[in-house]
């Protein structure tokens, strides 16, 4: 074939051969032919060959592409753009930005919007905000602000560099916003933890009176992720309805995300409904279900789902096994969890245990009060344990009041230079649980010396699509007087039922137990639960999400509320879901 091309006068045949080439060896043969016949000098042929080599070859060989590009004496703008784009897809994106700057200095080759777009993608890949700012200035001076595609890429840069303010400014300047522009803004808000703004945007986009843009599958995917993060079940149902009404329900990735969203909002019945209504399921679908069952405390059901998946001939992925081991941990299924972990180590699933898997097993052993065994497992790991694994063990030390081991764990975290405010809070909890107030005072002084500030607790509850957030002693809510009055009434009713504040949850060494009980009275989840009882009809399920691990006192408070007020209370804290019903919790008082 190559020999026949050398004698052919038709470039079309050659271009077709370049486009259809399938591997590096084939492209090297074509390269040799182009050099031998001098066809490499043909700008069109060179562009096609460079594009195929730099952009289409899997795996890409950026070094070979650079050598070919450097042999071109007078590369055109298209040739340069191809290389800048290739660098944006490589592991050396900064080289693409350097080429762009070199191009800018060449007055005979003025950059076009494509050059700026590919250079921005190089900055996105490398996280180079300063370089992006320089390109933004050039876009302005070159008069490219009306290029919607280029401006959308600029938004993506600011979003990636966690500069949502400038991303929003760019969005406002885009003359004609399409769905892609909106989706980049959605992604920006999610990445920058402006999750509630995503819901506002979705409503605005969905109700656009001009009808210029409507949410597509990607928009719905991002909105569902926001609902999952916030625990906004009602809004998630609205997005689900939109998906069904607009013919998007057949998309596998949307169905998988719906299963995950409902699970993370504590609605496993809806998650099951979506899962078993799917026309096809892949390993991501099963993983979403298993992980959802795990975080909601349905360990046996998660094991059943895993075995069912294997019967369908679907092999698990790393995340699937993380969900499975987590399910065993959250449900106290020690024997089952160790059995699956041993099967992993034997190579049955062709997946070697990673840090996440070890973390789940440490959690499993810690929950079962097998702290020494958990510590031994960590010390025997083939890879170096990370801070998350040590924090998992530290959490178990807090629950079981093992001060000595807790102090050892903190020393490991300090050695990793990974200690955080939450670690010290766990150790403070451990000290307070066993009444070592002098240790609490010492540790607080150390935290002050190290300028370690604790993260404030924040609890959220959704009402008719609106998310209401509370912090401890919150007085910002417009209905604060009603909320505090309701909370006082709840406390009175719970006291009659036998509720007593768990004063070990109060980390300050106050003078009396009464003072400690008062200090615990206005924790954020209590305010959220009181608001839920205030504004919803009797029998309505109350769903609360919290950014931190819920304390023992608030956990007891929720148990009593579920019994006295005959409500199902679902609290999602940093570690898991707590389903409170009839005075009991699905976590069996271990979290």
From Swiss-Prot:
Organism per entry: Arabidopsis thaliana (Mouse-ear cress)
Name used for this protein in its record: Pentatricopeptide repeat-containing protein At3g47530
Ranges where the record places region Type E motif: 389-464
GO molecular function, one term: zinc ion binding
Protein family according to the UniProt entry: Belongs to the PPR family. PCMP-H subfamily.
Repeat listed as a keyword: yes
A Pfam family: E_motif
Residue segments, region Type DYW motif: 496-591
């Amino acid at each position: 074939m190559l020999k026949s091309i050398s004698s052919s006068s038709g470039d079309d045949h050659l271009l077709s051969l370049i486009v259809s080439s399938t591997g590096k060896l084939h492209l090297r043969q074509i390269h040799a032919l182009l050099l031998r016949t001098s066809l490499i000098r043909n700008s069109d042929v060179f562009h096609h060959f460079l594009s195929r080599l730099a952009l289409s070859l899997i795996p890409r060989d950026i070094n070979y592409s650079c050598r070919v590009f450097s042999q071109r004496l007078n590369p055109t703008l298209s040739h340069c753009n191809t290389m800048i784009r290739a660098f944006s897809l490589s592991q050396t994106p900064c080289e693409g930005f350097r080429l762009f700057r070199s191009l800018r200095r060449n007055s005979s080759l003025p950059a076009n919007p494509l050059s700026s777009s590919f250079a921005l993608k190089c900055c996105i890949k490398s996280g180079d905000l300063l370089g992006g700012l320089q390109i933004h200035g050039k876009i302005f001076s070159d008069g490219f602000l009306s290029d919607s595609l280029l401006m959308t890429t600029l938004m993506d840069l600011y979003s990636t560099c966690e500069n949502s303010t400038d991303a929003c400014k760019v969005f406002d300047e885009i003359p004609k916003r399409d769905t892609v522009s909106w989706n980049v803004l959605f992604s920006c808000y999610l990445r920058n933890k402006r999750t509630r703004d995503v819901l506002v945007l979705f409503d605005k986009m969905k109700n656009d009176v001009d009808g210029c843009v409507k949410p597509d599958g990607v928009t719905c995917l991002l909105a569902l992720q926001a609902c999952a993060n916030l625990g906004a079940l009602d809004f998630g149902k609205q997005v689900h309805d939109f998906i069904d009404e607009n013919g998007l329900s057949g998309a596998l990735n949307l169905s998988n995300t719906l299963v995950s969203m409902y699970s993370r909002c504590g609605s496993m019945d809806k998650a099951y409904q979506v899962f078993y209504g799917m026309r096809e399921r892949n390993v991501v679908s099963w993983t979403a279900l298993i992980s959802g069952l795990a975080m909601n405390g349905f360990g046996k059901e998660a094991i059943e789902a895993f075995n069912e998946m294997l019967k369908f001939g679907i092999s698990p992925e790393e995340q699937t096994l993380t969900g499975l081991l987590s399910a065993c941990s959250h449900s106290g299924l020690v024997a089952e969890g160790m059995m699956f972990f041993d099967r992993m180590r034997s190579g049955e699933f062709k997946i070697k245990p990673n840090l996440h898997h070890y973390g789940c097993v440490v959690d499993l052993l810690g929950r079962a009060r097998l702290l020494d065994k958990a510590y031994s497992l960590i010390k025997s790991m083939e890879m170096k344990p990370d801070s998350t694994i040590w924090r998992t063990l530290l959490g178990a030390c807090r629950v079981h009041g093992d001060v000595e081991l807790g102090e050892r764990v903190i020393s490991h975290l300090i050695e990793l230079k990974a200690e955080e405010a939450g670690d010290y809070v766990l150790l403070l909890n451990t000290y307070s649980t066993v009444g070592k107030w002098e240790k609490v005072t010492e540790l607080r002084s150390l935290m002050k010396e190290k300028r370690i500030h604790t993260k404030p607790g924040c609890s959220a509850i959704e009402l008719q699509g609106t998310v209401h957030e509370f912090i401890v002693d919150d007085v910002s809510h417009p209905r604060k007087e009603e909320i505090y009055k309701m909370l006082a009434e709840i406390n009175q009713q719970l006291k009659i039922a036998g509720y007593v504040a768990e004063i070990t949850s109060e980390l300050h060494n106050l003078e009396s137990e009464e003072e400690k009980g008062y200090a615990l009275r206005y924790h954020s989840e209590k305010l959220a639960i009181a608001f839920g009882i205030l504004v919803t009809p009797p029998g309505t399920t109350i769903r609360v999400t919290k950014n931190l691990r819920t304390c023992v006192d608030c956990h007891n408070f929720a148990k009593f509320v579920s019994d006295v007020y005959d409500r199902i209370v679902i609290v999602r804290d940093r570690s898991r879901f707590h389903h409170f019903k009839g005075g009991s919790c699905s976590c069996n008082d271990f979290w």
